[in-house]
Amino acid sequence: VCLLSRTDQPALFCGDTLFNAGAGNCHNGGHPNELYETFAGQLAKLPDETMIYPGHDYIANNLQFTLDREPDNEKAKALLGSAEKQDPDAALVTTIGLEKEVNTFFRLHSPTVICRLQEAFSDVGDNPDPKTVFVKLRELRNSW
């Protein structure tokens, strides 16, 4: 369940659906295909300035996963440095625009992400569709 506030500064209270630099898991219900549809059909279409307020703060660990999948993501490297130094009482707040740059689950067309998936899964073809990339990333993240 997510709540979108459409004020001067749009904000998304996204519970366990979207995390800073990550995506929710489907262990307690839901399906990765449905989560993909939420990301592609709803979250990615929000204005870039939309502030993100997830239910939990896993940003450092999620950025480490991003860099495992996309080691050349300079924006994620810089944000990880900031996240590791953050005051726990003043957590970083990201935006949809920043998430599109650092969140692997929004970076489904990245050549590096796709190449690394092909190394991990023999059944990922040369031009996987975004849903396949998302579902395979979610599978990797489940055991990462």
Identify the function of each model-found stretch.
Residues 37-51, 58-144:
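Accessory terminal helices/loops
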Residues 14-15, 52-55:
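Short, conserved beta-strand edge motifs with alternating hydrophobic and charged residues
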Residues 1-36, 72-73:
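His/Asp/Glu-rich metal-coordinating catalytic cores
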